[in-house]
């Protein structure tokens, strides 16, 4: 019998090459540096962006939610998108930074993914 608790909650998939984004790497770096200055001044360790607009502004990834939540988590040294498994490796290819994929077979895997960053 298959134990459902052995299934992955999150994973990464770096398949294919990064696609061209709407803005340059330097522009995304500038945007993130500005946000990180505010974070440092307020002693904030991480920011979780959940609106489509903010995710796209800081990461370049524009998604269609299909009823599933997405995020961009910004820390002092990383910018990581959090995406649903339905998109496979596309979010990594189409974002400035890394990506973590959550599976939706178990409740709250999205929050586990966000919390892991």
Language-model-detected regions and their locations in the chain:
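A composition/biophysics-driven feature that prefers long, compositionally simple stretches
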Residues: 1-117
């Amino acid at each position: 019998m298959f134990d459902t608790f052995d299934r992955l909650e999150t994973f990464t998939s770096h398949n294919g090459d990064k696609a061209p984004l709407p803005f340059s790497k330097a522009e995304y770096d500038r945007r993130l540096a500005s946000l990180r200055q505010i974070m440092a001044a307020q002693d904030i360790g991480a920011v979780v962006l959940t609106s489509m607009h903010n995710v796209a502004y800081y990461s370049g990834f524009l998604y269609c939610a299909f009823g599933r939540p997405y995020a961009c988590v910004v820390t002092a040294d990383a910018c990581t998108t959090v995406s649903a498994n339905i998109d496979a490796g596309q979010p990594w290819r189409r974002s400035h930074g890394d990506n973590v994929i959550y599976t939706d077979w178990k409740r709250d895997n999205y929050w586990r993914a966000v919390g892991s960053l």
